[in-house]
Amino acid sequence: MIRRENRLRREFIFRKSLEEKQKSLEEKREKIRNALENNTKIDYNLRKDAIELAKGSDWGGQQYETDSEYRWAGAQDPKIVITTSRDPSSRLKMFAKEMKLIFPNAQRINRGHYDVKQVVQASKAQDSTDLIIFTETRGNPDGMLVCHLPFGPTAFFSMANVVMRHDIPNCGTMSEQYPHLIFDNLNSKLGHRFTTILKHLFPVPKPDSKRIITFSNSEDYISFRHHVYKTENDGEVELTEAGPRFELKPYQIKLGTLETLAAAEDEWVLRSYTNTARKRTFLSISRADDDE
């Protein structure tokens, strides 16, 4: 079983490396095509191979199966496994139970004394699509790991300002409808990447669903909100918070699963201690940048 997983992983990495080379070649062809159509100078680095690149520039682009790990995500509903760090507090257990109701088709398992490798292998054996692990500090949930199976990526988030359903008065019972998703102000390339990771944790909702989950970005903090709405007789819409609510701060994406993190490549890492870290936003593009 372990040798089979290692072989599949090596094949996946090999196919991805081949597609990266092909993707780089198509980008060069696109530059040549644009230069010829607009009658502009060809990039100095491409002039030597311009004739060869121009020969294949008339062919259409390719779709990359390996480059997008979520290409077939809409073909079937996601199957989520939710667990916690070792020796969880009662508050973290309660939070994991609430988050299990957030994700349709989710299954919560007790961590026990199993290590990460055993948890990932058990999730793969059940044909799960994603593994979510919640961590804590002194009884307060403070971290979320989202690992897409079977080959990654793995996204890391820190959590803050967690308010559970038990702390929200008169929140009522939680709806089990598939929720509609709202992603606000995640318009950069990295923002689209995190949108892809988060939205494929949920199945496709029905049009008449009254449940809404919002991921709203402000200064690289993603606010998670869960609401249910109903239409009154006079046509007004009443919005009720169902909880829980919290803030997510993404800080890393690894191109691998949790048991192979030591050998996995970094797709993106937040560098908090650089001189320009406070001035930059990674998940959104300002309107001034759009105007330029």
Curated annotation (Swiss-Prot):
A GO molecular function held by the record? snoRNA binding
Known Gene3D superfamilies for this protein?
Answer: Probable brix-domain ribosomal biogenesis protein (3.40.50.10480)
One Gene Ontology cellular component term attached to this UniProt record is:
small-subunit processome
Entry's Gene Ontology BP terms: rRNA processing
Q: What residue stretches are annotated with the Brix domain? A: 78-259
Q: Which domain of life is it from?
A: Eukaryota
Q: What's the name of the protein?
A: Brix domain-containing protein ZK795.3
Q: Which organism is it from?
A: Caenorhabditis elegans
